[in-house]
Amino acid sequence: RHGTPRALADLASHNFVTAGAVAPGHEMRFNHEGKSRVLKMQPRLATTTNESAVAAAVSGFGLTQQMLYKVAEPLARGELQEVLSDFEPPALPVHVLHREGRYASRRVRAFLDLAIERLRALPELRA
């Protein structure tokens, strides 16, 4: 309806769906050619969960900014389209932490090894 945005200025004519966990204060963060930009917007819909923001975007309520693993399935099914990929913010690292001091028990170590293996296997988490 509003066309596909190709530059940040194109976002002015679009509706937005925000999620509290991703866009505190209704902001979207972008990075282009090493420069960070923060755009404040008035969302058409503000949700409290990423899942509801994705569902709203799939239903046509507007654009949403989400981590790739949250939208991998709707993208693969053609329900969503990635836009402004040249303005994507830098990737965030994934950390697996444990509380047990320097050395983990065998059970914790086994869980950590499994979690790390599975996380590394997800293409959505690779930059």
Feature roles, as predicted:
Residues 1-94, 120-127:
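C-terminal regulatory
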